[in-house]
């Protein structure tokens, strides 16, 4: 067993398939205290998780194993690890990965600063990988460096959207019943074909459920089940709950899961996952300007238009003054979208200050941060061509900060003297800003758009 995070700063490329938001929420943690037998005010120390991550992803139709496929330039498995490690009462996370991808996994752990992760080598099947992960937590293994948990969660590396509430439910049920698993209603009717390819029978959809992840077990129950497991079940079995029933006579409690427990299986699922992630990190926009007192400042006008046009998004504003203390707090609170208003048309001073603050923070490690550098110009008084040369500095700025996962765009908004025309320019600018934030298109960084 190997523990992270060794390896290089940049993840290596995953090998081809070989044949053969924030911390845990107080309510959930408090509820688990009685489950794990901890004293009030202390985090439970009896829950671990095992993630089998040795699959080839043949149904994905790409050479890279799906757990390493990038979403917003970050491997899928990193999102799943993040979902688990932000739950403070999961003390150890064991990932089973193939030998040829061990270095890849180490570098992912290092680059994205994952914690509490230990690595073991995967087996040739899913069940053998899970068994190897359980062995890393068992007391009877000579080289085991981890303490045995009371409850172990088994989850898929390619289900990145698991929430703490679902984890809490299955752990609580496993504590009481010995085993528990998340289920969802069947989407399609299940049929059984006969040998000649005709319908034999169909299942009544209302009476059956789809087994999902996560699942949780008393560690002694599932470890004993795997120790007794036949070679046939280790090779061809797919359901961990069935092993607990078959070998330990433990009937699992079935827990209704949330709709976002789905598994990334096909290539189209990667696009769906990316869309969900983009939506989640686009729910807040901070308008940054050089003043906080003048309500008629054009930055405040833009803020009000953004609020009007994007009524489903939280829009706030902060000044760069006071050493940026309030702005630093917004960064700590994980806002991933900034609109920086520059007072002088050709001056990037405010944008440069903001970029420096972002680069000094750890905000950009997990998700790309969008910065829209906004400049205003009365096109009737000053033709855009006269200022364009200075504004094109944004190209070089964008190249530099892209290396630190910051997506920098430029926006030039017409600033006419007529109030009605100004409102229309601001509205067009808000539409462009919303699109840049929603799409997060790295191909457009350094471009100067005009509203």
Curated annotation (Swiss-Prot):
Subcellular localization, as worded in the UniProt entry: Cytoplasm, Cytosol
Substitution effect: residue 126 to H: In MDDGA7; also found in a patient with an atypical phenotype presenting with limb-girdle muscular dystrophy, ocular features and cerebellar involvement
One GO location term (cellular component): cytosol
Reaction(s) this enzyme catalyzes, per UniProt: D-ribitol 5-phosphate + CTP + H(+) = CDP-L-ribitol + diphosphate; D-ribose 5-phosphate + CTP + H(+) = CDP-D-ribose + diphosphate; D-ribulose 5-phosphate + CTP + H(+) = CDP-D-ribulose + diphosphate
Segments of this protein annotated with the region Disordered: 1-29
One Pfam family of this chain: IspD
Annotated disorder: Muscular dystrophy-dystroglycanopathy congenital with brain and eye anomalies A7: An autosomal recessive disorder characterized by congenital muscular dystrophy associated with cobblestone lissencephaly and other brain anomalies, eye malformations, profound intellectual disability, and death usually in the first years of life. Included diseases are the more severe Walker-Warburg syndrome and the slightly less severe muscle-eye-brain disease. Muscular dystrophy-dystroglycanopathy limb-girdle C7: A form of muscular dystrophy resulting from defective glycosylation of alpha-dystroglycan, and characterized by a limb-girdle phenotype with muscular weakness apparent after ambulation is achieved. MDDGC7 individuals do not show epilepsy, intellectual disability, structural eye/brain abnormalities, or white matter changes.
UniProt function note: Cytidylyltransferase required for protein O-linked mannosylation. Catalyzes the formation of CDP-ribitol nucleotide sugar from D-ribitol 5-phosphate. CDP-ribitol is a substrate of FKTN during the biosynthesis of the phosphorylated O-mannosyl trisaccharide (N-acetylgalactosamine-beta-3-N-acetylglucosamine-beta-4-(phosphate-6-)mannose), a carbohydrate structure present in alpha-dystroglycan (DAG1), which is required for binding laminin G-like domain-containing extracellular proteins with high affinity.
Oligomer status and interactors: Homodimer.
Record protein name field: D-ribitol-5-phosphate cytidylyltransferase
